Structures are given as C-alpha cells and as structure tokens.
Amino acid sequence: MIDVIDLKKNFGDNEVLKGINMTINKGDIVVVIGPSGSGKSTFLRCLNCMEDPTSGKIIFEGVDIADPKVDINIHRRKMGMVFQHFNLFNNKTVIENIMLSPVLCAKKDRRKAVVHNMFHKDKLPVHPVKEIKKEAEENAHKLLERIGLEDKADVYPSTLSGGQKQRVA
C-alpha cells in the first residue's frame, strides 16, 4: 500500500504538485491524467523517489520513503515503473535486459556488505555472484511468464513488437 500525504513539489517559484493526498491499495490500478505540464511525470518520479518532493510524505509499506534517512534501494526493489519512453539494450537478450538492474543492485549491496564486514562485528550476508545471477534469472523467467513472453527470453529487442518491448521494459 502507498499513502501519499500532502505531497508538494516546487521548481523554484513554480509549485508543480500542490498537496496531493491519496491511498493506493495493493492491486489498485491508477491512471494519472492531465494536460501537458500539469505534473503527472513529476508525481510519478516522486512516488518512485527519482525526484525529491519539496514536502509531504510517501508511505510505502509503513515507511516514509520521502525521508532522506531511508535507504530507498531496499524499497525500490519492490516497486516498478514503466516509462513513457522505455530503453532496452539492443545488444542484450530480453532476459539479460530484465536481469541487468537486479544484478547490478545486488552486486552493489554485496560490495557494501564486504566493506561493512571488514570494519564491524555484526556481519552482513555476502551472497556469491553466481547465486545473485541465478536468483535474478529465475525471477526474470517468472516475470516473462506473467506477461506471456516466456518464449522471448533469448531473443533480442529488435525482434519484438512495440507492445512486447513495453511489457519487457
């Protein structure tokens, strides 16, 4: 569940988001409609912490993810966002495109854990890279199955239709 409480975003003197309040429950389908320049993309970027709000709260699973002290990467793994303009790497297969971000994030966490463990008694788990890739691949196959593209795992984006590319992204 996501609770948005009095979310505001200014760019200089221009107030783009003016105190948005809403609750999005698990399974809800939400459409954000408005004229060009009305703040739709800014709102979505704030929800996914790609843009810092000027004020307000975004409560995701009980945590205010707009709080700068919160490690957003922990929560971002549970979120998804499909952009109007998507980018797939044409030199990578569909499965490699899907695995790329989770593998890079997990490797970054692994490096942080290694450094942490060098200086602290409370040890963090350090997962082998092979395990990270295996888990990412399993999850990617599940996602492809959910969107009906499991037969496209090993093809390149150039062979997909526009709708298929959108679903992969």
Protein language model annotation of sequence segments:
Residues 1-169:
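ABC family nucleotide-binding domain
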